[in-house]
């Protein structure tokens, strides 16, 4: 008798309404987390790319204009590349999900009002390629602007190089901590990973550019 009452309660209209709502809230939360992680990765890419370019140019030229021009060119090129790549990727994902939804509808002989509402909600939750492209470009630009702003007002070359490295390191730590909080992982491990990766990129760009630049000048 008790089990029948419990079954009737779980199958009641009120519980059936609250379940989709809870599932929708969970999906919305997951989508927000994915957007935040994507923005974080884009900003990290922009930071490491432009800081590495500036360090590479700074290894062979002390002119602040050259560093800033190369950094700005890297910002524009990287933001455009990220936007185009994200747009194409999201368009492909949207096409695949739309095709799957059409096939699912074709398999059903008749759709109830609830099914139609669910299909409409699924269509509304499909990613927007334009929004994804703009968000990716903005995230990359924010990260790329940090080393540029750190170097723009410093005339001394050595101090400028140190400031770029310090600004990049601080930003990498912030990105690592934020990523760990979003992913609920170890803050220390995530921060160390991100910082070491950024340092390696800057060091390799600095070393290889200096080596090739010095060899080219001797020819």
Swiss-Prot record:
Vacuolar domain ranges by topology: 59-67, 155-161, 215-219
Residue numbers on the Cytoplasmic membrane side: 2-37, 89-133, 183-193
Note: Can mediate sequestration of iron ions into vacuoles when expressed in the yeast ccc1 mutant.
Name of this chain's protein: Vacuolar iron transporter homolog 2.1
Cellular component, GO, one term: vacuolar membrane
Keywords: Acetylation, Ion transport, Iron, Iron transport, Membrane, Transmembrane, Transmembrane helix, Transport, Vacuole
Knocked-out gene: effects: No visible phenotype under normal growth condition, but decreased accumulation of iron in the root when grown under high iron concentration.
PANTHER family listed in its UniProt record: FE(2+)/MN(2+) TRANSPORTER PCL1 (PTHR31851)
Residues found modified as N-acetylthreonine: 2
């Amino acid at each position: 008798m008790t089990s029948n009452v419990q079954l009737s309660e779980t199958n009641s209209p009120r519980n059936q309404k609250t379940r989709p709502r809870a599932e929708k809230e969970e999906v919305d939360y997951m989508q927000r987390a994915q957007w935040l992680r994507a923005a974080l990765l884009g900003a990290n890419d922009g930071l490491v790319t432009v800081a590495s370019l500036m360090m590479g140019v700074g290894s062979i030229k002390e002119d602040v204009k050259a560093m800033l021009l190369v950094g700005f060119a890297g910002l524009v090129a990287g933001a455009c590349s990220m936007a185009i790549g994200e747009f194409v990727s999201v368009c492909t994902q949207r096409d695949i999900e739309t095709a799957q939804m059409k096939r699912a509808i074709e398999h059903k002989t008749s759709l109830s009002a609830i099914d139609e509402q669910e299909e409409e909600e699924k269509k509304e939750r499909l990613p927007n390629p334009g929004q994804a492209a703009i968000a990716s470009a903005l995230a990359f630009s924010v990260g790329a602007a940090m080393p540029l702003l750190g170097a723009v007002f410093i005339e001394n070359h050595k101090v400028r190089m140190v400031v770029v490295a310090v600004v990049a390191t601080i930003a990498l730590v912030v990105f690592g901590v934020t990523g760990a909080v979003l992913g609920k992982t170890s803050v220390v491990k995530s921060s160390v990973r991100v910082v070491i990766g950024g340092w390696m990129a800057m060091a390799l760009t600095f070393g290889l550019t200096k080596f090739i630049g010095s060899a080219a000048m001797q020819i």
